Amino acid sequence: MTRDMPDQLGRETPRDGTVLAFDYGEKKIGVALGNFITRQASALTILPNVTVEARFDAVGELIRQWTPVRLVVGMPVNPEAGPDDEEQPSMRLARRFGNQLNGRFNLPVEWVDERYSSRAAAMAGAKRGALDAEAARIILQQYFDELPL
């Protein structure tokens, strides 16, 4: 059994295990996959976001298939917003999605600032149909890159 190591915020960071990351959108959810050993993220798939039931059935299937130890959700932070400003609708939706992931699947959820992930994915040459999965990959890679060694 591996021991977890605390990250800079005191949370336990596994030494190994799979991570799934999500770029939540009202119509589509990009998904990426990575692990703590290689700390490399790969675009995995795009889930249609049609109904709550279909969304979590699809996520549940991915969780059964990949057995992640942690989930990462991109948080669309507004760089212009101040600390006392009301949370934007896109932030509320992403936070709600992450909280629902935690509640439904009992897995820890981490948040990553994803404000430029879709733009970075497009600039990196991601095809239009793969943009959301590539944005999720960028979110997950940022998460890995910010972990202590």
Swiss-Prot record:
InterPro entries per UniProt: RNaseH-like_sf, YqgF, YqgF/RNaseH-like_dom, YqgF/RNaseH-like_dom_sf
Main subcellular location: cytoplasm
Keyword Hydrolase: yes
Biological process, per Gene Ontology: rRNA 5'-end processing
The protein's Enzyme Commission number: 3.1.-.-
Record key words, sorted: Cytoplasm, Hydrolase, Nuclease, Ribosome biogenesis
Function: Could be a nuclease involved in processing of the 5'-end of pre-16S rRNA.
Similarity comment: Belongs to the YqgF nuclease family.
Protein name: Putative pre-16S rRNA nuclease
